[in-house]
Amino acid sequence: MLYYFLRYINEMFNPPGMRVIEYLTFRASAAAITALLITVFAGPSFIRFLKSHFLEPVKEEAPEEHRKKKDVPTMGGLLIILAVEISALLWAKVDDPHVWLIMLAVLWMGLIGFIDDYRKVVLKIKGGLAGKYKLVGQVALGLVVGFYTWNDPAFSVLLSKTSVPFLKNFSVDYGIFYIPVVIFIITAVSNAVNLTDGLDGLAAGNAAIVTMALGLFAYLGGNAVYAGYLSIPFISGAGEIAVVSMAIVMACVGFLWFNSNPAEVFMGDTGSLALGSAIAVIALMIKQELLLPVLAGIFFIETLSVSMQVAWFKFTKWRFKEGRRIFLMAPLHHHFQLKGWPEQKIVIRFWIISILLFLTSLMTLKLR
């Protein structure tokens, strides 16, 4: 909204330097700074409020080190959501469908996560919101995003097609499977970020790295010259996604100010589901969802570790009448915890891997 006000001032009075408001790089930077300032300065009072109402419940099977965190408040994802939504409203073109679809995803899945956290923390219902209801929420978001992007003229150029990493001028057409694919990706990615949120700073740091890469792809894909040169899909208006992406990145960085070890607050499902859905929706809109197994490799591996653990345990229980495990505990970060790795070392090493995957994803722009 501030964007529209400043543009009006520019058109009416043409003050020196005001034309900068039209530049995506300026607005993306402004959104990033705004999100960072909101999280850092609102954080202390926000945490005090959460601490008086919402303390993190600790699972009985959690590692010993994790049990020490029973007095740390959760639902800190509300702070991330607040920072992202305010920054997007101020600096992005909110009438652009790319922008409001991301904002909708963050709000909707943030609400689903909040209900889950509230049931666990306040109502003391073990397990929180039943998985089937979370799935209903994820499917509902997938249907909205899928049907809207299928029918809206702003997305009609590529429609159900998507780009394939490493292959030049090659696309895959989902056809009638487009909407089911959208639902699957939103569900998978939001759950993956949720599973990764188990150590101080792990989910927020990796989400920031992944979203920064997607924001860069959005900026390049929204420019016809850059998109043509790099042989990636040109998405008219996708540059606005970069503005919201940078707000998400710096909201996560600001959250890390309080969430880094030892954490003063956890994001909870409120934050992890919101961030995961935002990553999925951004990737889908810029036609880079097939890059996610590489770019979001940490989230992918964490999810795979859980799937492998459950499948192997069930198979061995059926085959040998005794359940066996591949990992000491899943998700994978808990396996390393039980092997004696310090929490900070696990988180930093996972961040380093994410940065490596970030750079690998950028290499796909030319390895075609």
UniProtKB/Swiss-Prot annotation:
The keyword NAD does not apply. Pathway: Cell wall biogenesis; peptidoglycan biosynthesis. It comes from the Bacteria. One of its GO terms (molecular function) is phospho-N-acetylmuramoyl-pentapeptide-transferase activity. Its cofactor is Mg(2+). The keyword Transferase applies. It is found in: Cell inner membrane. One of its GO terms (cellular component) is plasma membrane. CDD domains: GT_MraY. Its EC number is 2.7.8.13. InterPro entries: Glycosyl_transferase_4, PNAcMuramoyl-5peptid_Trfase, PNAcMuramoyl-5peptid_Trfase_CS. It catalyses: UDP-N-acetyl-alpha-D-muramoyl-L-alanyl-gamma-D-glutamyl-meso-2,6-diaminopimeloyl-D-alanyl-D-alanine + di-trans,octa-cis-undecaprenyl phosphate = di-trans,octa-cis-undecaprenyl diphospho-N-acetyl-alpha-D-muramoyl-L-alanyl-D-glutamyl-meso-2,6-diaminopimeloyl-D-alanyl-D-alanine + UMP. Keywords: Cell cycle, Cell division, Cell inner membrane, Cell membrane, Cell shape, Cell wall biogenesis/degradation, Magnesium, Membrane, Metal-binding, Peptidoglycan synthesis, Transferase, Transmembrane, Transmembrane helix. The chain crosses the membrane at residues 30-50, 72-92, 98-118, 139-159, 170-190, 201-221, 238-258, 262-284, 345-365. Pfam families: Glycos_transf_4. One of its GO terms (biological process) is peptidoglycan biosynthetic process. It is a multi-pass membrane protein. Belongs to the glycosyltransferase 4 family. MraY subfamily. Catalyzes the initial step of the lipid cycle reactions in the biosynthesis of the cell wall peptidoglycan: transfers peptidoglycan precursor phospho-MurNAc-pentapeptide from UDP-MurNAc-pentapeptide onto the lipid carrier undecaprenyl phosphate, yielding undecaprenyl-pyrophosphoryl-MurNAc-pentapeptide, known as lipid I. HAMAP family: MraY. This is Phospho-N-acetylmuramoyl-pentapeptide-transferase. It comes from Chlorobaculum parvum (strain DSM 263 / NCIMB 8327) (Chlorobium vibrioforme subsp. thiosulfatophilum).
